[in-house]
Amino acid sequence: MCIRDSPNPEVPGTEPPAPIKLGFDSLPTSMTDGCVVPNGYVAHVFAPWGTPLNDNAQPWDQNGNNSSNDLLNAMGMHHDGMHFFPIEGSSTEGLLAVNHEYIDENALHPNGPTLVAGKRPAEEVRKEINAHGVAIVHVRRANGRWTIVNNSRYNRRFTSATAMKLAGPVGGTDWVKTPFSPNGTQVRGTNNNCGNGYTPWGTYITAEENWAACFVNTGTRPAHQRRVGVSAGPAGRYRWETATGDATEVLGEFARFNVTETGASATQDWRNEVNGFGYLVEIDPYDPTSIATKRTSMGRFAHEGCAYSKPEAGKPLAFYSGDDSRFEYVYRFVSEAVWDPKDADRTDRLAVGAKYLDRGTLYVARFNADGTGEWLALTGATQGTGGRTLADEFG
């Protein structure tokens, strides 16, 4: 502690700086069940669950009578992370990327989820699958209110059934080969999208979080499935796999949620389907023809979000993400490529993403008892507490 006999003298002819004030009146503590904003501000609901994005969807029905096709062409359920991408720098028109993290089954269906002779109806399952994922929505503000631009070419949905690319070190390996993608370069869907991020080149990052329990293994779960929390049965979280064998099923769309090893190889059952989930997914909101890409270099876990450090020309980029499960870790991905400011203005945004996000080093944070910490590189040569390297463990 430092004690002075008298305060610091003021500099002659100057006035002390004015205290910093909020630009709005603070709100008192309240038990009000509603959205309350300060005086001079207005809040209104727009783009809620079920809002059509185009004329292929019927208006939202509060009794749960909308179809799976309606949900494929409308806002998904339970909005979470989101980001606004301006169109030509505008603050009144742009593309809103919105995560749809999970579902409320009782609200989706007229009588809640049904189970008939141990099976879920295919239409109900498709509806739930389409209520998950991400929406890219063209929005515009006029007269103080935001609205969706219906039928905009930018409006699109990514669901738990949308085909996506697997990029980085996992893509194309034996770990992700399935009957749907025998070469391991694609996977269907993104699930339980919680937090989010964005990139310096204008793409959206959606984080897959609590995806593991949507899958079930009724046999012997390998260590990597136990580690992430794949269900041991008798069913997955939503019982989507029970619709297997429905006459309308296409390419194992329901069977894939049962990752029990039953075939002679990975392309004869769905053991690897779950390995296509647990990543940060990059989406180009400005290109409605682009394919969402899972950036496997950035780690596989229950991602909560993604944030990057200040880009500096000639230096690598760093992206930070946390595993939002109990007793888990904080991670940092450092790109192999160094930042070129010209890449911020390129229109081939997913190619830029491949440049920075497909090759690099993933680190995990270690926090010491004395308050210090360090970043531990997760490479093949990294040793664990038992002295074995990651290469020894995983080959």
Regions found by a protein language model. Give the residues of each.
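Conserved small/polar residues in nucleotide/adenosyl-binding loops
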Residues: 1-6
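Conserved small-residue
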Residues: 8-395
